[in-house]
Amino acid sequence: MRIAVAGATGNIGGRTASFLEAGGHDVVRISRSLGVDLLTGEGLDAALAGADAVVDAISSPPVSPEETLEYFGTTTRNLLAAEQRAGVGHHVLLSIVGIARMDGGTAHYVGKREQERLVEQGAVPWTIVPATQFHDFAGLASSWTERDGVATIAPLLVQPIAPDDIAQVLAEIAAGPPQGRYVDVAGPETQDLVDMARRTNEVLGRQVKLVPTWSGPLDLSMAGNVLLPGENARIAPTTFDQWLAAGAR
């Protein structure tokens, strides 16, 4: 199959593209740095010519909720319109477990909800894949607020998944038929985000004092079980400990 991956130079998109290629598929990498701009549509029609499926694993720059909504809205509309022109038969969207159950969350969550809405209402057959936070999310979250060796971070309850594991799931789904809303995809164990950040920073040699708080980018709308997968979730194999032992990559 010919499968395009949007966000192919990113953390999950790059891994997904590699797994698809390892599976024998013809992969088209879509990224602004590779000459395809989802915001303007430049290069998009040429990139999707002959494509059977598209995986959307793009992320957004760290901006306001309004700007993130505009970014995800524009890029998703452009991508879906180009897919329809090209006759693409399957749009696979990487999303986030729990975002439909909350009104708040980060700016990124606001944008992902808009992506889901556009995909569900669009003309291209689709699969939305809700995943839990990735194993590297805790280290990233602590870096958002770090100042002079001190970082605030919310004590979220999460069930994180290894980046390689979710990329393999996306590659598998992209090679098959559209499935609508897929089951939640998660790692095997629940974790506390503060402890994850502490252990990640230790492995990476970072000296950061962590201060647990809900007064930050991750707020009380994300507390409790809201970010945990449903009972029928697909559970990926790699534990957080195994990911750390492999060098936190």
Name the predicted role of every residue range.
Residues A22-A86, V97-A107:
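NAD(P)H-binding glycine-rich loop region in Rossmannoid oxidoreductase-like domains
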